[in-house]
Swiss-Prot record:
Protein name: Intraflagellar transport protein 172 homolog
Family of this protein: Belongs to the IFT172 family.
WD repeats: 14-53, 64-103, 110-148, 150-190, 195-233, 238-278, 284-323, 483-521, 522-559, 680-725
Free-text disruption phenotype from the record: Fishes display cysts in the glomerular-tubular region of the kidney similar to cystic kidney disease. Knockdown of the gene with 2 morpholino oligonucleotides leads to ventral body-axis curvature, formation of kidney cysts, otolith defects, and hydrocephalus, as well as cartilage defects of the craniofacial skeleton. Knockdown of the gene in a rhodopsin-GFP transgenic line demonstrates that the level of rhodopsin-GFP is lower in ift172 morphants than controls, suggesting retinal degeneration.
Source organism per UniProt: Danio rerio (Zebrafish)
Gene expressing this chain: ift172
Ranges of the TPR repeats in the UniProt entry: 691-725, 750-784, 809-842, 854-887, 912-945, 947-971, 972-1004, 1042-1075, 1272-1305, 1328-1361, 1407-1441
Length: 1745
C-alpha cells in the first residue's frame, strides 16, 4: 500500500483547531468533516466543497460552545449522518441524496453521559460508546436506545470489522471488548478480548487481526482471540510521539496509524500471516493527526490534523491501464477499482474472503470482468454492476470464458462446463462436455415469467456430438436426454425452457417438447433458424421459403412465404418483428404478424381473455384454427369455461360448445346462489369429467353427492347400460328389474342378438342364449356355451343344430371339438381333417384310430408344405417315415444341417442325389470343408476343385487334385488353366495357379509380357529377392528407352539409383524433373548442382533468372569458381553480381598459383585488388625481385615486410650481415636485436641496441643478467662485484637470487649477507622488505633464533616473538615481550594457551587457564578430573560443572550417579539448576522395582538432598516461591518412599507400608500414576484390604489402557469422587510395569469381579470421608498428613515443633516400638530425619492418654 498526496481539502490554521472527526459515505459520493467550531463540511468525491451545516446543542439555552462533536458516521444508504456530542446526545441529520437538500434532524438520542465514539454498521442500528463506559445501540426506526454491554471505564475508541457485523470498543483502562451482531459462523468469542498496556485510542480491526496503539509508542497486533501476534516498538525512537488514531482499509488488509507528523502503514501478508510495515509517510509540520477516514472503495484516505487541516491521499498498491480503455487501481490485495476511462463509471471488485487478486481482465466486448485469486474466481458485469465470487481451485489460467449470454458466464475448463450467474456467489451448475461452442449450449434463466413458476433455470448441452442433455439447474436433475442419428450443429431452448430446437449437420431442424419427451422433425433442410425474442414463435428458412411457426405446440401448422435470398437477422423492436433477408446487393425486411406473436405471449402469460380478444380479430385459417385449439385446451385446463365454449364454437364443434353452454348455465346459477365461479360444484366437475371422457370420475363426483339417478341418467344417455345396471345393483335401486327389461327390449329392438344372448346367459337362460347366438350367426359362441354346460350337451337337438351351423360356417375344428365331447369320434376326426386341425386329429387318432396316425402325419406334413411351413413339416415327415420328403422339406426350408443329418442317416443310395445340392449351399456360404466332404461323397470331385478354384483357394484345390491326379497332370492342368486365365485377362487368378504349381517364373514372364511391371516386381520381391534392385534398374532402362520417363524414374528410385534418374532427365533436357528428384532424393547439395548444370546449359540472362528463382545465384557463382569454371562464373557475375568479380579473380589467381602459372596469377591477384597476395606468393617462392617490383608498384606498405622476410631467410642461412642490412633498411632494429638474442649473439644485440635504440639498453642489460644461466658461483661472483662497486641494492638482489637446495650453509650465508648489506647500506623500508623475504626463509630452515635476531635488528618485535613461538622458544618469546614490548605479553600467553590446548596438555593448561582446562575436561568426558579440579576452585565454578556432569548423566540414564554427586557436593539453590533437580526426581521415581527394602538407601539419599535443597531455598530469594513449594512436595514424596522402604523390611510395619503407598496416590501429579496405583493396589492386597486393592488395581488397568491409547480422557473417576486423589494427571510416556505383571493383575481383577465378594467402595472414617483423604467431603476442612503414614491426623495426634507437622499417635507409637524391638538402622534413620525435618521428636516412649 502506497500513500500519495493528492490535495488539501481544508487549509490548516496557525494554532490548535483540531479536526474532531471525519466520515466517508458508503456510496463513496460524499465526505463529511467536522471542525473544532462544530460545523460539518460536506465534500464531493473529488474533494470539492459542496455543502455545510452547523450542529446544534442538546439544549439551546446552553449555547454552542458547551459541547464538542466526538464522532460521526453516515447511514448505510448515505442519506443521513449521525453526530455524537459531549453534551450527552446523538443527533441524526437527514441530508438527502442531492447537494443542497434541506438538512433535517430526523432522530435524537439523549444519553446519561457524554457520547465519545460512534459507528453505524447496519440500516437502523447505531452503536456508540459513553464516557461512563457503556456501549449502547440506538434504533433509528423506533428512536429508542438500549445498552448492549457496560463497563466501568471510559470508551476511548470504537470500530467495526470489515463486514460491519462485529464491534470492538477500547476503554481507558486498556480493555478491548468484542461484540457481534452476527458472528457469521466464525465461532469467535464475545466479551472482554484483551487488555492493552495503555488506553487504546488507536484501534483498528483488520481481516485477520486487531491493531491497537496508544501513548506508549507501541503498536501491537492481536490475534482473533486476543493473543499477541506482533509488536512494533518505537519507544526508543525520539522522533516518534504517541499514536492518536488508526483506520483500517475497507478490505481490512491495510491499516494506517497516525501520530505526530507521521502516518505508519501496515499491510497484511496472507502468505506469512503477519503485518509488514511499509516505509512511513513523514510530513513535516503536519502536527498531530486527530482523525482518519478511509473511502469505502479503498482508493482515498483522508487525514485530519490538530491545526484543522484536512489532507487527501491516494491509496493504492499499484495502478495500471488496461487496453487503453480501463484504469485498474489495486487499493488492497483483495480489492481493485476498475474505471472506464471513456465514461468514468467505476466498479469495485473485491474478494469477500480476503483472498489476493492476481490479475483483472476485461473481456466479452469490454463488458465483463474476470479475476483470479488463489481459491476463488471473481466475475462481474460492468453494465448491470452485478458481481460474483465463486470457489475456484487453481487451473493454471487455462479456462475459456464465454459471454454470449447476458445473465450467465460460461466457463469451460478441462472438459467441464461451469455456469455462474452474475450477482450470485455460487456456481449455478456444472456438467461434463467436450463441446464448448455457444451454439451447442443453451442457458435460460428466468427470461420470461410463467404462472406458478418461481425459479426457472434450464440448460441444454451436448454430452457427445449426437446426444443432447437438458438439465434443471435449480433442482440439479436431468429433464431429458435426446439421442440423435446425426451430428448436431446448433441448439437453443425457448425462453421458458419448455421446448428445444436443434439442427443437425444434414441441416434437418427438430423440435423437442421437454414435458412430453416428444421429438418431431420440422424441416428437412434449414440453413437459418431462430426463436423470436419474447415469444415462442420460431422463424426458419427452408430453401426458397421463410417458415414461421406462430403456435409451436402444433409443429405441423407452419406459415410460409417465398423468398429469394438468405435470412441474415431477426429484429424485434417498437412492437414490430422483422426478418432481414439478404437478396444479393439489397437487404429486404419481412414483417411478421405481431398479433399471432402476441397470441403466443398472452397464452404463456395465462391471459386467456386477451388471447380470445385477439383471435376474434382474425379470419379463420389453418394457423388461427390451431390457435383456437390451443386456447380451448388451455382454457379447459384452467377451468375458464366461457372461453372454452367460445373456442369450440369458433372451431365449429357444436356438440362440445352446446355441452359447455349447459355446463356454464349450471355454474352461473351456482355462482349466483353461493358466490364463487361455480366450477367447484359437483355437477360442473362431473360434466367436465364427461367432456374429458373420464366417466368413472364423473360417476365418482355424482356418487359423492349420492346423486344415483343422475349417474344412471348419464349412463343411459350414453347407452352404457352395463355401467348403469352396475350402479343400480350397487345401490339396490328399486327400478333395477325394469332397467334390465328395458335394456333387453332395447337390445332386441336394435337387433343386438349377441348382447341379448349375453344377457340371457348372465340370467341363466342357456337355451335362450344358444338360440340367440345362433340367430346372431355366432355358432362358435353357442358351441363354447354348450361345451361348458352339460345340460345343453345332453340335448341331441341343440348339439345337432349347433354342429350343423358350425359345418355350414366351416368352423370344422369347433364342430370336431363338439363331436369329440359327444363321443362321436369318427365325425370328430373327419371335421378335424377338414378343418386342418391335425394336432387334435393326431391326438384323437392315437386314442381312437392308431392305424391312422402315420397317414395323418404325412397329410399334416403335406398341408404344412402347402402352407409354405417347410420347417414345421420336416418332423411330421420323419414321424411318417417319409425321409425323401423330409430331406426335400429341409432343403426347401433351408434347414441344411437338418437335411444333411437326415441324409447321412439314409442307407439307400437314391438319396445321394441330394449331396450335390447341399454341397452347393455350403460352397455358397464358404463352408468349403463341409462342401468338399459332400462333393466327394456325392462323387463330384471336379465340382469341389472348381469350387476351390473359384474361391481362389488354389492350395486346397491343388491338394484335392493331387489326391485324384498325378503331379504332371496337375501341373499341366494348372498351367494350361493359368494360360487360359491369362488370355481372359484374369492375371491374378493365373498368377495364383502358376505359384500353386511352383512356376513363379511363368507368372513373372506373363506380367513382363503384358508390361504389368508392378506385379512383376512384386513377384520378384517374393521369389527372387536378390535380383530385385537389378530388375528395377533393368526395367527403368527399358522404360527410358521407350521414353516412359515417369515410370522409369519410379524404378530408378526403387533401385536406389536416383543419379541415373537425374541423368535420364538431364539428357532429355527435362531439367525441372531432374531438379525435383535431386532435391527430394539427393543430399543437401545435389539439387544445387542440378540447378547449376541447368543454368549452365541455358547460359546468359536465362541462367541468371533461373538461379535467382531458386535463390542459388551466389551459390552457383561460388560453385563455378570453386570448380574452376571461371568463364561461366565471370559471365554470371558480370550479368548480375558485379561485386563478386574480384572474388572470382582471386579464386582464379589461387588456381593459377597452384598450377605454377605465377605471372598469370600475379595479374589475377592485382585484378582482384589483392596485390599483397601476389607479393606473398613471390615471397613464398623466394622470388624477391618480383616481390619487390609488385610491392613498389601496387603495395608500398609491403616493401618493409619483404625486407623483413628476406632478412629472416638470410638469418636462417647464417648470412647475418645481409640480414642486418635488410632489417636496418626496413627500419626494424628491434627485430635485429631479437634475432641476435635468439641466436645467443648478445654482443651484436648490445651493439645494435647501443647504436639504434640506446633508451632500451639498460632493459637489455637486465634481461641479459636475468637470462644468463650463470650458476650459483657466477651469481655469487656477480653479487660480490656489485658489492665492490657500491651497487648494494643489486648485490642484495643477487644474493637473494641464490637458490641451491643441495648446499644449505651456502644459502644461509648468502641470505644473511643480503640482510646484513640491507641493514647497513639500504633504507629502513628496503631493509624491512629484505627481512620479510629472508626471515620466513630462515624459519623454513628452522633457524628460528637467527630469524628472530634479524627481526630484532630492525625493531620488528612481534615478528621476532612469532619466530620464537614458531620454534616453541616460549621463555625467549616472553622475555622479549616483557623487555621490549609489554603489550605483547598477553598475546604470548594467549598463543601459549592455544598451544597447550592444541597439544592436549590439559594439566599444564590448568596452571594457565583453569576454566579453559575445565571445559576441555568436560569436552573429553574426563568428568572426575573436571570435578576434582573444579572443587579446588570456588563453589559456583564447581556447581557449574556438576550441573553439566549431571545433565550428561541424566541423558546417559545414570540418574543414581547424579544423586550421589549432589550427596557429595551439596545442592545450591540456583534457579538454573531447578530443572536438573526436577529431572533427577522424575527419573528416580520412574525407576522400576524400587518398591522394596533394598531401595532404602536411594530414597533416603533423595530425601536428604531435597531437604538440604529446601533449607537452602528458605535462605535464598526463592523462598516461598512456586518452585520452593514444588520441591517441598517432592521432599514429602521422597520421605514417604524412604519410610515405606524402611517399613518394608519389618513385618509388623506392613500396614504402615501399605498406608504410605496409598497416601502417595494424592501425589500422582508428580509420580507416575500407573506405578502409584499398581504399588498401592499390591500393598492393599498384601494386608488384606481387598476393597481398596480391587479399586486401585482396576484403576491401574484403566491407566495402562489409556497409556496405550495416548490419552486418559476416557477414564471414569466415579470411584474417586470426594477424595483428594487428582483426576487430571500427566499421561506417562510408557507403562512402568511389565506386560506379564499387568496380565496377572487383569486376571486377579476379573476373578474378584466375577466372585462379587468385594464391594467396589473405598472405606470411610468418622468424617464420612474416604479414610486416606486429607480433605473432608462434607466440610472441606483439610487435615494434616501423618509424617509416618501420610493418612489424615484427626483426634489422637502428636505435634512437632515445626508448624504443620504432626503424626497419628497410634502409627507413631507402632513405628517407635518396631524400631526399638528390631534395632532397624533404616527405621532409626527415618526417626533421625523426622527430628531434623520436623524440629525435634516428642518425648520418647508410648503415649496411652
Amino acid at each position: 500500500m502506497q500513500l500519495k498526496y493528492m490535495k488539501t481539502l481544508l487549509t490548516p490554521q496557525d494554532g490548535a483547531a483540531k479536526v474532531t472527526c471525519m466520515a466517508w459515505a458508503p456510496n463513496n459520493a460524499k465526505f463529511a468533516v467536522c471542525t473544532i467550531d462544530r460545523v460539518v463540511i460536506l465534500y464531493d468525491e473529488q474533494g470539492e466543497k459542496r455543502d455545510r451545516f452547523t450542529t446544534k446543542p442538546a439544549d439551546p439555552k446552553y449555547g454552542k460552545k458547551t459541547y464538542v462533536v466526538k464522532s460521526m458516521a453516515f447511514s448505510p444508504d448515505s442519506t443521513k449522518i449521525a453526530v455524537a456530542q459531549t453534551d450527552n446526545i446523538i443527533f441524526v441529520y437527514k441530508i438527502g441524496e442531492e447537494w443542497g437538500d434541506k438538512k433535517v434532524i430526523c432522530n435524537k438520542f439523549i444519553q446519561t453521559s457524554a457520547v465519545t465514539s460512534l459507528v453505524w454498521p447496519s440500516e437502523h442500528a447505531i452503536i456508540f460508546g459513553l464516557a461512563e463506559g457503556k456501549v449502547r445501540q440506538a434504533n433509528t426506526k423506533t428512536s429508542k436506545s438500549s445498552t448492549i454491554y457496560g463497563t466501568d471505564s471510559y470508551v476511548v475508541s470504537l470500530t467495526s470489522n470489515v463486514s460491519g457485523k462485529g464491534i470492538l470498543s477500547g476503554h481507558a483502562d486498556g480493555t478491548v471488548v468484542r461484540y457481534f451482531i452476527d458472528d457469521e459462523g466464525s465461532g469467535e468469542s464475545q466479551g472482554k478480548l484483551l487488555t492493552h498496556a495503555c488506553p487504546p485510542y488507536a484501534l483498528a480491526w483488520g481481516t485477520n487481526s486487531i491493531i491497537v496503539a496508544g501513548c506508549d509508542k507501541k503498536i501491537v497486533a492481536y490475534g482473533k482471540e486476543g493473543n499477541v501476534i506482533q509488536t512494533f516498538d518505537y519507544s526508543r525512537d525520539r522522533a516518534e510521539k504517541e499514536f492518536t488514531v488508526a483506520a483500517s482499509s475497507p478490505s481490512g488488509q491495510s491499516i494506517v496509524v497516525g501520530s505526530f507528523d507521521r502516518l505508519r502503514v501496515f499491510n497484511w501478508s496472507p502468505r506469512k500471516g503477519t503485518w509488514d510495515e511499509s516505509s512511513p509517510k513523514e510530513i513535516p509540520n503536519l502536527y498531530t493527526i486527530t482523525a482518519l477516514s478511509w473511502k469505502k472503495d479503498g482508493s482515498r484516505l483522508s487525514v485530519g490534523t490538530l491545526c484543522g487541516g484536512v489532507e487527501m491521499f491516494d491509496c493504492c498498491l499499484r495502478r495500471s491501464i488496461y487496453k487503453n480503455k480501463f484504469e485498474m487501481t489495486y487499493v488492497g490485495l483483495s480489492q481493485v477499482i476498475v474505471r472506464n476511462l471513456s465514461t468514468g463509471t467505476r466498479v469495485v471488485l473485491k474478494s469477500q474472503y480476503g483472498y489476493e487478486i492476481d490479475e483483472v481482465k476485461v473481456m466479452g466486448k469490454d463488458q465483463y470482468l474476470v479475476a483470479h485469486t488463489s481459491d476463488t474466481l471473481l466475475l462481474g458485469d460492468l453494465v448491470s454492476n452485478k458481481l460474483s465470487e465463486v470457489a475456484w481451485q487453481g487451473s493454471g489460467g487455462n479456462e475459456k470464458f464465454f459471454f454470449e449470454n447476458e445473465t450467465v458466464c460460461m466457463i469451460f475448463n478441462a472438459g467441464e462446463l461451469a455456469l455462474v450467474e452474475y450477482g450470485s456467489n455460487d456456481i449455478l451448475g456444472s456438467v461434463r462436455t467436450e463441446f464448448m461452442n455457444p451454439h451447442l449450449i443453451s442457458v435460460r434463466l428466468n427470461e420470461r415469467r410463467q404462472r406458478g413458476v418461481e425459479d426457472n433455470k434450464k440448460l441444454a448441452y451436448l454430452i457427445d456430438i449426437k446426444t443432447i442433455a437438458i438439465v434443471d439447474l435449480v433442482g440439479g436433475y436431468n429433464l431429458g436426454t435426446i439421442s440423435h442419428d446425426s451430428k448436431i450443429d446448433w441448439l437453443e431452448l425457448n425462453e421458458t425452457g419448455r421446448k428445444l430446437l436443434f439442427r443437425d449437420k444434414k441441416l434437418r431442424l427438430h423440435l423437442y417438447d421437454i414435458e412430453s419427451s416428444v421429438k418431431s422433425t420440422m424441416l428437412s433442410f434449414c440453413p437459418y433458424v431462430q426463436w423470436v425474442p419474447g415469444s415462442d414463435v420460431v422463424v426458419a428458412q427452408n430453401r426458397g421459403n421463410l417458415c414461421v411457426w406462430y403456435t409451436i405446440d402444433s409443429p405441423e401448422r407452419v406459415t410460409m412465404f417465398p423468398l429469394k435470398g438468405d435470412i441474415v437477422d431477426l429484429e424485434r423492436s417498437n412492437g414490430k418483428t422483422e426478418v432481414i433477408v439478404n437478396e444479393g446487393v439489397n437487404s429486404i425486411s419481412y414483417t411478421l404478424d405481431e398479433g399471432l406473436i402476441e397470441f403466443g405471449t398472452a397464452i404463456d402469460d395465462g391471459d386467456y381473455y386477451r388471447a380470445t380478444a385477439f383471435l376474434e380479430t382474425l379470419e379463420m385459417s389453418a394457423e388461427t384454427e390451431a390457435m383456437w385449439k390451443t386456447l380451448s385446451k388451455l382454457s379447459l385446463e384452467a377451468q375458464q369455461l366461457h372461453i372454452a365454449e367460445r373456442c369450440f364454437a369458433a372451431l365449429g364443434d357444436v356438440s362440445k360448445a352446446r355441452f359447455l353452454n349447459e355446463t356454464n348455465k349450471i355454474a352461473d346459477a351456482v355462482a349466483k346462489e353461493y358466490d364463487g365461479d361455480g366450477t367447484d360444484h359437483y355437477q360442473v366437475k362431473a360434466r367436465l369429467a364427461m367432456l374429458d371422457k373420464n366417466f368413472k370420475l364423473a360417476e365418482m363426483y355424482y356418487m359423492e353427492q349420492n346423486a344415483v339417478d343422475e349417474v344412471m341418467e348419464m349412463y343411459q344417455e350414453l347407452h352404457m347400460w352395463d355401467e348403469c345396471i352396475a350402479v343400480a345393483e350397487g345401490k339396490g335401486h328399486p327400478e333395477l328389474d325394469n332397467l334390465r327389461r328395458s335394456y333387453y327390449s332395447y337390445l332386441m329392438e336394435t337387433n343386438q342378438n349377441e348382447k341379448a344372448a349375453e344377457v340371457k346367459e348372465n340370467e341363466g337362460d342357456f337355451t335362450g342364449a344358444v338360440n340367440l347366438y345362433l340367430k346372431a350367426g355366432l355358432p362358435a359362441k353357442a358351441a363354447w356355451l354348450a361345451m361348458s354346460k352339460d345340460e345343453l350337451l345332453s340335448s341331441q337337438d341343440i348339439v345337432s343344430r349347433i354342429t350343423a351351423a358350425l359345418i355350414k360356417g366351416e368352423f370344422y375344428e369347433r364342430a370336431g371339438d363338439l363331436f369329440e365331447r359327444t363321443r362321436n369320434n369318427q365325425r370328430a376326426l373327419e371335421c378335424y381333417r377338414k378343418g386342418n386341425a391335425f394336432k387334435k386329429a393326431v391326438d384323437l387318432a392315437r386314442v381312437a384310430f392308431p392305424a391312422e396316425v402315420v397317414k395323418l402325419e404325412e397329410v399334416w406334413g403335406d398341408y404344412l408344405v402347402q402352407q409354405k411351413q417347410m420347417d414345421a413339416a420336416i418332423n411330421h415327415y420323419i414321424e411318417a417315415g417319409r425321409s425323401i420328403k423330409a430331406i426335400e422339406a429341409a432343403i426347401a426350408a433351408r434347414q441344411w444341417k437338418k437335411a444333411l443329418h437326415i441324409l447321412e442317416l439314409q442307407e439307400d443310395r437314391t438319396a445321394a442325389k441330394y449331396y450335390l445340392k447341399i454341397a452347393q449351399y455350403y460352397a455358397s456360404v464358404q463352408e468349403f470343408e463341409v462342401a468338399e466332404r459332400l462333393f466327394v461323397k456325392g462323387d463330384h470331385i471336379k465340382d469341389a476343385i472348381d469350387m476351390y478354384t473359384q474361391a481362389g483357394r488354389w492350395e486346397q484345390a491343388h491338394k484335392l487334385a493331387v489326391k485324384c491326379m498325378t503331379q504332371e497332370d496337375v501341373s499341366v492342368l494348372y498351367v494350361s488353366r493359368a494360360q487360359e486365365l491369362e488370355k481372359e485377362g484374369k492375371y491374378k487368378e493365373a498368377e495364383r495357379l502358376f505359384t500353386t504349381v511352383d512356376e513363379p517364373d511363368l507368372a513373372i514372364t506373363m506380367y513382363k509380357k503384358n508390361k504389368m511391371y508392378d506385379d512383376m516386381i512384386r513377384l520378384v520381391a517374393v521369389h527372387h529377392k536378390d535380383l530385385l534392385q537389378e530388375t528395377h534398374i533393368h526395367l527403368a532402362k527399358e522404360l527410358e528407352a521407350e521414353s516412359r520417363f515417369q515410370e522409369a524414374e519410379y524404378h530408378y528410385l526403387e533401385g536406389q539409383d536416383w543419379k541415373a534418374a537425374v541423368n535420364m532427365y538431364r539428357v532429355n533436357d527435362m531439367w525441372e524433373e531432374a531438379y525435383r528428384i535431386a532435391k527430394t532424393h539427393g543430399g543437401a547439395n545435389a539439387h544445387k548442382q542440378v540447378a547449376y548444370l541447368w543454368a549452365k546449359s541455358l547460359g546468359g540472362e536465362a541462367a541468371v533468372k533461373l538461379l535467382n528463382k531458386f535463390g542459388l545465384l551466389e551459390t552457383a557463382i561460388d560453385f563455378a569458381a570453386d570448380n574452376y569454371t571461371f568463364d561461366f562464373a565471370f559471365e554470371l557475375a558480370r550479368l548480375s553480381m558485379k561485386q563478386k568479380i574480384p572474388d572470382i579473380h582471386l579464386k582464379n589467381a589461387m588456381f593459377l598459383e597452384d598450377q605454377g602459372k605465377f605471372n598469370e596469377a600475379e595479374i589475377e591477384f592485382i585484378k582482384a585488388g589483392k596485390p599483397k597476395e601476389a607479393v606473398l606468393m613471390h615471397v613464398h617462392n623466394k622470388d624477391w625481385s618480383n616481390a619487390q617490383r609488385v610491392a613498389e608498384a601496387h603495395d608500398p606498405e609491403s616493401v618493409a615486410d619483404i625486407l623483413v622476410s628476406q632478412a629472416k631467410f638470410c638469418f636462417d642461412q647464417k648470412e647475418f650481415q645481409k640480414a642486418e642490412a635488410f632489417l636496418l633498411r626496413a627500419q626494424r632494429p628491434e627485430l635485429a636485436i631479437k634475432y641476435y638474442k635468439d641466436a645467443g649473439m648478445w654482443t651484436d644485440a648490445m651493439r645494435i641496441c647501443k647504436d639504434y635504440l640506446p633508451s632500451k639498453l639498460s632493459v637489455l642489460q637486465k634481461e641479459y643478467e636475468s637470462e644468463g644461466n650463470w650458476g650459483v658461483e657466477g651469481m655469487i661472483e656477480q653479487a660480490q662485484e656489485w658489492e665492490q662497486t657500491g651497487e648494494y641494492s643489486r648485490a642484495v638482489d643477487c644474493y637473494l637470487k641464490v637458490k641451491d637446495s643441495s648446499n644449505l650453509d651456502l644459502l644461509l650465508k648468502c641470505w644473511m649477507k643480503a640482510a646484513e648489506l640491507a641493514i647497513k647500506f639500504l633504507s629502513h623500508d628496503k631493509a624491512v622488505d629484505v627481512s620479510q623475504i629472508v626471515g620466513p626463509r630462515l624459519i623454513q630452515l628452522r633457524k628460528y633464533n637467527e630469524a628472530a635476531e634479524l627481526y630484532l635488528n630492525l625493531d620488528l618485535i612481534k615478528n621476532a616473538i612469532d619466530a620464537f613461538i614458531e620454534g616453541e622458544e616460549w621463555n625467549k618469546a616472553k622475555r622479549v615481550a616483557k623487555e621490549l614490548d609489554p603489550r605483547l605479553e598477553e598475546y604470548v600467553d594467549k598463543r601459549y594457551k592455544e598451544h597447550l590446548k592444541n597439544q592436549g596438555k590439559v594439566d599444564s593448561l590448568v596452571g594457565v587457564d583453569v576454566v579453559a582446562a575445565l571445559d576441555m575436561y568436560a569436552e573429553r568426558g574426563q568428568w572426575e578430573k573436571c570435578i576434582d579440579t573444579a572443587s579446588k576452585q570456588n563453589f559456583k565454578v564447581l556447581h557449574k560443572y556438576i550441573a553439566l556432569y549431571a545433565t550428561h548423566l541424566i541423558k546417559e540414564g545414570e540418574v543414581e550417579k547424579v544423586l550421589s554427586l549432589y550427596i557429595q557436593h551439596g545442592v545450591p539453590a540456583y534457579s538454573q539448576n531447578f530443572n536438573i533437580y526436577k529431572r533427577m526426581f522424575q527419573e528416580l521415581v520412574n525407576l522400576r522395582d524400587r518398591d522394596c527394602a533394598e531401595a532404602f538407601r536411594m530414597w533416603s539419599d533423595l530425601r536428604d538432598v531435597l531437604l538440604l535443597l529446601c533449607e537452602n531455598l528458605t535462605k535464598s530469594s526463592e523462598a516461598n516461591s512456586p518452585a520452593h513449594e514444588e520441591f517441598e512436595q517432592m521432599l514429602l514424596v521422597a520421605h514417604y518412599y524412604a519410610t515405606r522402604s524402611a517399613a518394608k523390611g519389618i513385618d509388623q510395619l506392613s500396614s504402615v507400608a501399605a498406608k504410605l503407598s496409598i497416601s502417595l496416590l494424592r501425589h500422582t501429579e508428580l509420580i507416575p500414576a500407573d506405578k502409584a496405583f499398581y504399588e498401592a493396589g499390591l500393598a492393599a492386597k498384601a494386608v488384606g484390604w481387598e476393597n481398596m486393592a480391587f479399586i486401585f488395581l482396576n484403576r491401574f488397568l484403566d491407566l495402562a489402557d489409556g497409556i496405550d491409547e495416548g490419552t486418559l480422557d476416557a477414564l471414569d473417576h466415579t470411584d474417586f469422587q470426594d477424595t483428594d486423589i487428582p483426576f487430571e494427571v500427566p499421561v506417562p510416556s510408557r507403562l512402568h510395569v511389565t506386560v506379564e505383571k499387568r496380565e496377572e493383575i487383569r486376571e486377579w481383577v476379573l476373578t474378584v469381579s466375577m466372585d462379587q465378594r468385594v464391594e467396589q467402595v473405598l472405606p470411610k472414617d468418622e468424617r464420612g470421608t474416604y479414610e486416606a483423604s486429607l480433605v473432608a467431603a462434607s466440610t472441606g476442612i483439610r487435615s494434616l498428613p501423618c509424617v509416618i503414614t501420610g493418612y489424615p491426623v484427626l483426634r489422637n495426634k502428636i505435634e512437632f515443633k515445626r508448624p504443620g507437622m504432626a503424626a497419628n499417635k497410634d502409627d507413631w507409637n507402632k513405628f517407635l516400638m518396631a524400631t526399638k524391638t528390631t534395632h532397624s538402622p533404616e527405621c532409626q534413620d527415618v526417626l533421625k530425619f523426622i527430628t531434623q525435618w520436623c524440629g525435634g521428636l516428642p518425648s520418647a516412649g508410648y503415649s496411652f492418654h
